A protein has these predicted regions:
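Residues within the DNA-recognition helix of helix-turn-helix
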Residues: 52
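Glycine-centered, phosphate/nucleic-acid-interacting loop/turn motifs that mediate DNA/RNA or nucleotide
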Residues: 60
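Amphipathic alpha-helical dimerization/coiled-coil segments
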Residues: 1-8, 77-104
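N-terminal helix-turn-helix DNA-binding core of bacterial DNA-binding proteins
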Residues: 7-48, 66-80
Length: 104
């Protein structure tokens, strides 16, 4: 179980380790944005933006919906909070006994 959880965290951080995806998150931190705005602001082609959005959606970091026929991206603050704060850095959620630690 812990190996699967560690792999999931590793993949989550891989998704975040891309400059363009971080820029997308910075834009969404202030307000929801439609795809056209993001393409223009970040100087991306539609296919490039879609690929990055799909990676972020894979881990529910963002979600999309149509508003008045326009596709809009939204930051999922709850998921980010769970991954970045509550889960990893909360000693009550994970215990050291479940990991093999190297002795120095």
């Amino acid at each position: 179980m812990y190996d699967r959880k560690i792999k999931n965290y590793s993949n989550f951080f891989k998704v975040l380790s891309n400059d363009v995806r971080i820029k997308i998150l910075f834009e969404l931190a202030f307000s929801n944005k439609n795809y056209t705005y993001l393409m223009e602001k970040l100087d991306l082609k539609q296919s490039t933006l879609s690929n990055h959005i799909s990676k972020l959606r894979e881990y529910w970091i963002i979600y999309t919906l149509k508003k008045n026929g326009i596709l809009e991206a939204r930051l999922n603050r709850k998921v980010l909070s769970e991954y970045l704060c509550e889960e990893i850095f909360n000693p009550h959620k994970l215990s050291v006994e479940n990991y093999e630690l190297d002795k120095v």
